[in-house]
A protein has these predicted regions:
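Short loop/turn microsegments at loop-to-beta-strand junctions
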Residues: 22-24, 70
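Short beta-strand scaffold segments in enzyme catalytic cores
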Residues: 24-32
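Zinc-dependent deaminase
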Residues: 1-19, 65, 81-147
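A short, polar/charged loop-to-alpha-helix boundary motif
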Residues: 41-55
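Immediate flanking context of iron-sulfur cluster ligation sites
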Residues: 64-76
């Protein structure tokens, strides 16, 4: 089931890619149903906070901001801002595709959702469909450098 939802997140990431955004996509699932889908819109919206995770959290929060019964699927390991937002939303679980060795905050640089200093902890699993997620990111940056 995880792979099915990560494939949807990858569809969102492709939308970002096609519109010149860093290709990150996110899907929030509750009880086996998709309740939110989003992709990066930082360039489009001229908003540094318009990361896929933030947009998906906002959509999903319309049914209530506590998301302990939700799983977030995202194509790239969340950054510090998004990891903090996931904690504040009390997300139940996070599954991500590619690791982010430079600013990933669910295991690569730091593990925000595993830190007992914060109120909410949640499991996070990385590497699902990692190859596909990483290749899309690499294609984006190769294209960007070529422009």
């Amino acid at each position: 089931m995880d792979k099915k939802f990560m494939a949807l997140a990858l569809e969102e990431a492709r939308k970002a890619f096609d519109s010149g955004e860093v290709p990150v996509g996110a899907v929030v699932v509750r009880d086996g149903q998709v309740v939110a889908r989003a992709h990066n819109l930082r360039e489009t919206d001229k908003d540094p906070l318009a990361h896929a995770e933030m947009l998906a959290i906002r959509q999903a929060a319309k049914d209530g901001w506590r998301m302990r019964d939700c799983t977030l699927y995202v194509t790239l390991e969340p950054c510090p801002m998004c990891a903090g937002a996931l904690s504040m939303a009390q997300i139940g679980r996070v599954v991500f595709g590619a690791f982010d060795e430079k600013q990933g905050c669910l295991g690569s640089v730091y593990h925000f959702l595993a830190d007992p200093a914060f109120y909410h902890q949640a499991p996070a699993e990385g590497g699902l469909m990692e190859k596909e997620c990483r290749e899309l990111m690499q294609r984006f940056f190769e294209r960007r450098r070529g422009d």
